[in-house]
Amino acid sequence: VLQPAPALELTAPIVLITGTSMSSGKTMSGRLIVRLLSQMGFNVVGAKLTGAARYRDVLSYEDAGASAVFDFVDVGLPSTVADPEDFKTRLEDLLRRIASAKPDVVVAEAGASPLEPYNGKTAIDVLGDRVRFNLLCASDPYAVVGVASAFNRQPDLVAGGAANTTAGIELVRKLSGLTAMNLIASDSHQPLADLLKDKLQLR
């Protein structure tokens, strides 16, 4: 039996990680962002908001330094292929649970792609302007254009397979006008940390 969620509102800024497909580098990128923000001294909470139940994804955020982790399974969903209204109610419940962990910042992953039937679009609508930084993990530069054009908000940064080479980064910029970064390369970590601090307005 699910315990009722506390009557709290989540006000912390959110880093939202979306992807063009199921295995596009979201969890690896999320782990890095959790680690960077934790090293800056912030209380980081990790969450997986949509997708299919693979708890190891979100548990790896704990290994990276998150003080707590949450998953849609915590509100009784084995996957988020669900009625959008029911999912919305449960997601709001999940956000109240996340708020109870008193995060300075939330690193949230929307599993699969927002165009797949996992309610990614509903999740983005519910989160609204709490999302201060949107990372799109893409398998290839052409996929960036498809997903980026499907939403009102443009990603702040592109990562994943599309950005693992200089040629890929340049092609992302040429096709979409977006900035891409190879997060596997350690020399990208400081620029990413600076970008996060700026967008999240964390002090």
Where in this protein do the model-derived segments appear?
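Conserved catalytic-core segment of NTP-binding enzymes
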Residues: 1, 51-54, 60, 84-100, ...
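Residues at the starts of beta-strands that form the adenosine-phosphate
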Residues: 43-45, 68, 104, 132-133
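P-loop NTPase switch/communication element
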Residues: 45, 54-81
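Short aromatic/hydrophobic-glycine micro-motifs
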Residues: 42, 66, 177-178
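Charge-biased, low-complexity intrinsically disordered regions
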Residues: 6-10, 39-43, 184-186, 191-202
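Conserved beta-strand scaffold positions in the cores of enzyme catalytic domains, especially
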Residues: 14, 69, 180-182
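Walker A (P-loop) phosphate-binding motif
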Residues: 2-52, 163
